[in-house]
């Protein structure tokens, strides 16, 4: 018995599509694989478990400001090295590395914009630049932003997201910025100018202990770490086990430290409502 030879259709392979490993990553919380582009389009929130990723200062401003309304102020200011600090690396070398890595000149971006059609002044901290630590330029730009607000009588919006506290490279000059920013923020209350403070993960150290908690209205994203010293440091000091949600947004809300817990996607709308009620 003879068998016919099967005929096979030859399919020419198409050009290979290269999928870069950098385009995918695992969620820190649920371990699901996420496509970076989709994750960024979702405002860096995991679609599976809702874990919030950290955003840069410019990403924050782009999310909040009306399209093409943001104008940066004092963007050319950079830190000096008053102490000629030398550690593993010199301060000047560290600053140069951070500028190249983040595309920012400092850990804060300040400027004016419109949010829901209302003119505002915004100051956003970038945790990617030396952990969002507060040095002389951060304090000076924040102070100038508040003084500009007092002149224009616009609402002031600060977005805090820095866990680095005072910047050790600048010593006492850095510590002084806590008093400086807190003092100038007090002038907003005296002038009756609206100050909305937005707390994001992480809002810690000198930023939490100065201007971040001085807003007339304080909003925070869900699950953000907010406090002065970290929970492990506190546990070691008081020798007691802290609640699992200690220093998280929800814990602070329950204890009256925060006015509104706002999802990231709803943050602009919530701020717009506040501005329309209390400013316009």
Language model features with spans:
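Glycine-rich anion/phosphate-binding loops
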Residues: 101-107, 132-147
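A structural preference for short, pocket-lining loop segments at secondary-structure junctions
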Residues: 115-124, 141-166
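STAS-typified acidic loop motif
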Residues: 118, 124-136
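Intrinsically disordered, low-complexity segments enriched in small/flexible residues
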Residues: 1-104, 112-115, 274-280
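A generic structural signal for short coil/turn motifs at secondary-structure boundaries
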Residues: 36, 131-134, 166-170
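Structural motif
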Residues: 37, 159, 198-199
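Conserved catalytic cores of soluble enzyme domains
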Residues: 163-279
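Short glycine-rich loop/turn motifs
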Residues: 106-110, 119, 154-155, 193
């Amino acid at each position: 018995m003879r068998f016919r030879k099967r005929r096979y259709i030859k399919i020419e392979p198409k050009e290979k599509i290269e999928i870069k490993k950098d385009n995918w990553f695992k969620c820190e919380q649920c371990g699901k694989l996420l496509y970076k582009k989709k994750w960024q389009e979702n405002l860096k929130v995991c679609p599976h478990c809702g874990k919030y990723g950290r955003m840069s200062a410019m990403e924050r401003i782009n999310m909040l400001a009306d399209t093409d309304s943001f104008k940066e102020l004092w963007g050319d200011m950079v830190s000096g090295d008053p102490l000629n600090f030398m550690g593993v690396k010199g301060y000047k070398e560290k600053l140069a590395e951070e500028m190249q890595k983040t595309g920012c000149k400092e850990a804060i971006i300040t400027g004016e914009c419109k949010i829901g059609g209302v003119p505002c002044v915004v100051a956003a901290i970038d945790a990617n630049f030396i952990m969002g630590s507060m040095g002389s330029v951060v304090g000076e730009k924040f102070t100038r932003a508040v003084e500009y607000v007092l002149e224009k009588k616009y609402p002031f919006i600060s977005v805090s997201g820095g866990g680095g506290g005072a910047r050790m490279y600048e010593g006492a000059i850095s510590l002084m910025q806590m008093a400086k920013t807190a003092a100038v923020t007090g002038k907003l209350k005296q002038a009756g100018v609206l100050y909305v403070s937005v707390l994001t993960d992480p809002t810690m150290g000198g930023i939490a202990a100065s201007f971040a908690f001085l807003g007339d209205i304080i909003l925070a994203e869900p699950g953000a770490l907010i406090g002065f010293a970290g929970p492990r440091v506190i546990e070691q000091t008081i020798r007691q086990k802290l609640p699992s949600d200690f220093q998280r947004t929800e814990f602070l809300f329950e204890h009256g430290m925060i006015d509104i817990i706002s999802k990231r996607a709803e943050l602009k709308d919530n701020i717009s409502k506040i501005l329309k009620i209390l400013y316009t």
